[in-house]
Amino acid sequence: VIAAALTLLVLAQGRIPLGVFESWGAFRDPSPPRCFAIARPAGQSGRGEAFASIATWPREGVRNQLHIRLSRPRAANARVTLSVGDRRFELKAGAADAWAPDWRTDTAIVAAMRDGRSMSVETLAANGAPFADTYALKGVATAIDAAAVGCARR
């Protein structure tokens, strides 16, 4: 069900499917060329269109870049923390998006995701209430690899 919803969401936006792997999908945008693994939360406390993605932008030399869309807007100065197993990463964030502060952190996050079972993104909502979006990581390694291959052969 999650995979089907992911496919419909992404196909509706003109993306080319590269495969669906458990709760993660891999897709390619033709112009500008970029490929990504993407998933919706397995559990979320908000109501928005939350997702986590790991993107490759070949023309920009970007590989394995994390992007999180939060399920609700966060409080202006609230920290956003990504947890994978016992690893914790503080993310940079906008009102409803978060990302790693640098490529080294992206690399560490992706390595943790490949070995993890689940990850959660925690912060405070605009009203001050804590919330978390939780993602199952089964299939993430294969989806990331499929996205990398999808852009490598183009």
Q: Residue spans of the language-model regions?
A:
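Hydrophobic h-region of N-terminal signal peptides that target proteins for export
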Residues: 2-13
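A generic "folded-domain core" signal
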Residues: 11-154
